[in-house]
Design a protein with these regions (language model features):
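Short beta-strand scaffold positions
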Residues: 40, 91-92, 149-151
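Conserved nucleotide-sugar phosphate-binding/catalytic loop shared by glycosyltransferases and other
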Residues: 31-73
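Active-site proximal beta-strand in glycosyltransferases
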Residues: 7-12, 89, 106-120, 138, ...
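N-terminal subdomain of nucleotide-sugar transferases
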Residues: 1-41, 55
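A short, active-site helix/loop in glycosyltransferases that binds the activated sugar's phosphate group
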Residues: 47, 143-163
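Nucleotide-sugar donor phosphate/pyrophosphate-binding loop at the beta->alpha transition
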Residues: 19-22, 69-76, 111-114, 121-144
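Short His-centered aromatic/hydrophobic patch
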Residues: 92-98, 117
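An amphipathic, basic-hydrophobic alpha-helix
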Residues: 60-89, 99-107, 132-140
Length: 163
């Protein structure tokens, strides 16, 4: 984003994640002089997020459900959003925003793409098909990141095994 302040777009599927889970972090970025934008599907927590001084941009097709057509639309929405905003950083959170947002950010030539793994969708007890799908999606999206952050040692170890 052109201007004097660096800009960061945080991407989640739901506005409640932006407001309740990431709210203090977003406020800290804003207090440090960043232009902070939250991007998610619209919902009832947008007003509370904006009351924190965080701009919200709706991504209508970014939902938790797995719908390939809606997911492609969400990826296009994210690409257009990043092209229009020209942020310095895109930071994705959770599996689906990471799978869609990291490639979209790289395609839009965002200078820094960061992802936080808040947990992996596939567990050892899940079927082989699901575990393989998650691994392929995560590895592909991680190739689009400049930095990958994890919140627990189990996910760090799993991702290291996956390569």
């Amino acid at each position: 984003m052109s201007g004097l302040r660096p800009s960061v777009v945080h991407v989640t599927t739901t506005d409640i994640s932006l407001e309740l889970l990431l709210g203090p972090q977003l406020e800290a970025f804003a207090a440090a002089g960043w232009n902070v934008i939250g991007a998610s599907a619209p919902g009832e927590h947008v007003a509370a997020l904006e009351a924190r001084g965080i701009r919200h941009v709706p991504v209508d097709h970014l939902t938790r459900s797995m719908d390939p057509r809606a997911d492609l639309r969400a990826a296009r929405e994210l690409f257009r959003l990043f092209k229009n905003l020209k942020p310095d950083v895109v930071h994705t959170h959770n599996p689906k925003p990471g799978w869609l947002g990291r490639p979209a950010a790289r395609a839009a030539r965002v200078p820094a793409v960061v992802n936080t793994v808040h947990g992996l969708y596939a567990q050892p007890s899940d079927g082989r098909t699901l575990r393989t799908m998650v691994r392929v999606l995560e590895r592909g999206a991680a190739a689009c990141s400049h930095a990958e952050l994890t919140q627990n040692p189990e996910d760090t170890a799993t991702l290291a095994r996956w390569g």
